[in-house]
């Protein structure tokens, strides 16, 4: 297995379907030009905003999954700048799940953020996604906030989590 930092083009080519599934699930219409343009723009803008996509591949080059995070290291000489990072999205192709690969990717994110001056890492997950919450809790993240109704008034919302690096 190889872990590399993907550029935007490679990320879109290899993980577009995973991102669409994470962000919009079955609400995404593959025939709707507005949907396609919106996703591509959202990915592009996110890459422009100091994000990094760490992507895992098999030795044969088959995509496994990714952790996409933002760490703005800030202005040189400004003490509070660059101390936090945020996981934007992460996902593994189903056949590669529950093999320790997600943990390896998360550890690599933590190491990179810390080596670049980061002191803490945040993430958020849908409250109904117990597997995701347990993944992070088992790896040292602490739930710190609940934002109900984030995806609509009848939605359970997001749980925000924090880990000191």
Which residue ranges define each predicted feature?
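Extreme N-terminal starter segment of soluble prokaryotic enzymes
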Residues: 1-2
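Conserved GNAT acetyl-CoA-binding A-motif
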Residues: 113-125
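Conserved catalytic-core motifs of GNAT/GCN5-like acyltransferases
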Residues: 122-125, 137-158
